[in-house]
Design a protein with these regions (language model features):
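Short alpha-helix immediately C-terminal to the canonical SAM-binding loop
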Residues: 32-33, 71, 94
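Conserved S-adenosyl-L-methionine
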Residues: 118-128
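Conserved Class I S-adenosyl-L-methionine
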Residues: 98-120, 126-178
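Class I SAM-dependent methyltransferase SAM/SAH-binding core
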Residues: 7-52
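A short acidic, Gly/Pro-enriched loop at the edge of an enzyme's catalytic core
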Residues: 50-62
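Conserved beta-strand signature within the Rossmann-like core of class I S-adenosyl-L-methionine
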Residues: 81-93
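Short, small-residue-biased leader/transition segments that mark boundaries at the very start
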Residues: 1-6
Length: 178
């Protein structure tokens, strides 16, 4: 679904006489293969956010979803005045999943962020809920940091569920390179 959004946006820019180049990086080969199938017009590489295989000042816009903030590399890759959308979990993100995994579930910390060389220009939170069937719960769980620090009994409780309805919350933080 996200690839369709990127494809439509790229087409809209091209029709307006402003063609775009899209590139994506992930440290996971399966994620890169999946992205390349979904949006073949973009260029992809298995790479870390901390060492992106592009020239300095290449990007007008960076989108970083749930990955570490590679401040120096983002500053290098963005052109002056370029923008970055940094997507982080909101306070309630996957709260009901954590209630299954842990004896004492917790909300994600929501903190103000400041990054040298970047000026904050906007923020928006989007939230809702999803119902995840048993067949997809393990995949969702494996994409979270909880996968690596959850006690076995918590993971077993999650695996035993026929489905899980949980909150999702995303904070979109928008910055401009100074």
């Amino acid at each position: 679904a996200a690839s369709d959004v990127y494809k439509r946006q790229a087409q809209a820019f091209a029709q307006a006489g402003r063609p775009v180049q899209l590139a994506g990086f992930d440290i996971a080969k399966p994620a890169v293969r999946l992205a390349a199938k979904a949006l073949p017009a973009a260029k992809y590489a298995v790479a870390s956010s901390f060492a992106q295989p592009v020239r300095t000042g290449w990007a007008d816009l960076l989108l970083n979803c749930f990955s570490p903030f590679a401040q120096e590399e983002f500053r290098r890759v963005l052109r002056p005045g370029g923008r970055m959308i940094y997507v982080v979990p909101g306070a309630e993100h996957l709260y009901q999943m954590k209630a299954v995994l842990y004896d004492t579930p917790y909300k994600n910390p929501v903190q103000e962020v400041a990054y040298e060389g970047f000026r904050p220009i906007g923020e928006r939170e989007v939230s809702g809920s999803i119902t995840v069937p048993a067949g997809q719960l393990e995949a969702l769980f494996a994409m979270t940091p909880y996968y690596w620090k959850t006690p076995r009994d918590g993971a077993a409780r999650l695996a035993a569920l026929p489905e899980l309805t949980t909150d999702i919350a995303f904070r979109f933080l928008v910055f401009e390179k100074e």
